[in-house]
């Protein structure tokens, strides 16, 4: 597998949607605004409006995004195995998960987190997959060297 040589780290995370919805619903909680960017919240609110019969639509969307953020931190940590963390505190708002015009999710580190990723790993590609099945949201993140050869590039 020629593409594997460019893989730096892989992360996976699962989130229970019901428990996550309860955390979001705690009165006075700032979890949503301290964890999700305005763009992420707007996308989740839009999904909720599109699916009024689904009381968990917003929480499901945000649970998947939170799983992606957690999976990213695990992939970054795996890429630095044997070395100290590159950042003492990760700010969730610096890890944004949005969708492209065709609905595919992408993850964009920014701020101190983006700078620390660049400094600790160099230029990387962030590959993200999010899924929802029943009461669970899950995400996988693969960090790869930017421009690394892939199986598609192989003869």
Model-derived regions: residue spans:
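Core catalytic alpha/beta fold that binds nucleotide/phospho-ligands
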Residues: 1-155
């Amino acid at each position: 597998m020629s593409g594997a040589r460019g893989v730096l780290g892989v992360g996976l995370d699962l989130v229970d949607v019901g428990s996550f919805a309860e955390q979001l619903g705690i009165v006075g909680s700032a979890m949503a605004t301290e964890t999700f960017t305005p763009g992420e919240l707007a996308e989740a609110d839009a999904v909720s409006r599109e699916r009024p019969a689904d009381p968990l639509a917003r929480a499901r969307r945000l649970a998947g995004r939170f799983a992606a953020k957690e999976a990213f931190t695990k992939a970054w940590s795996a890429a630095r195995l044997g070395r100290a963390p590159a950042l003492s505190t990760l700010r969730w708002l610096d890890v944004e998960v949005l969708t492209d015009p065709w609905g595919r999710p992408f993850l964009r580190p920014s701020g101190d987190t983006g700078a620390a990723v660049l400094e600790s790993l160099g230029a990387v590609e962030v590959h993200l997959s999010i899924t929802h099945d029943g009461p669970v949201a899950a995400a996988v993140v693969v960090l790869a060297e930017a421009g690394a050869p892939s199986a598609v590039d192989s003869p």
